[in-house]
């Protein structure tokens, strides 16, 4: 295993651990209820929230493993069926998230941030499925990267929130939450697009023959 492959695996492992951790916590919340979270918005549909959190949790649990090359190569059937689970979870989670986005107590700026996340998340995921079904695996890879970048917004959201709370001595100002509603996913998508743009060069380099020894 080369240093580069070790580095790539390490990056994937960090992403997978964070995703599984957040996804597992989401399912724990779904199973135990949300009363201990102190939700104060009476207009928020608790079932819409439950569906969003549960489905998004499933997407987080299985999403990172769709990019695990040994799984794709050695267990393609497992890869395919966990992919179907991922697509279903993202679709349900995104639709449920879109329905509750504007009930946030942080106002319409945060609401639009969460709503547009759902607007992009669902079609990106369905386009990943459609490209796989027509065996256009290059397009499938691109759309899956975009989809998972948005799925990973659940992780980045939970990275930004405690940072904002610590910086504000235990409080979370509404302005900070409004910013986080966008920061949780827009930078992820930008990074995904930059990575997608680099894929042809990375694949050419990987396919190039090794230099002859001196």
List the model feature ranges, each with a label:
Residues 1-214:
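Alpha-helical membrane insertion/targeting regions
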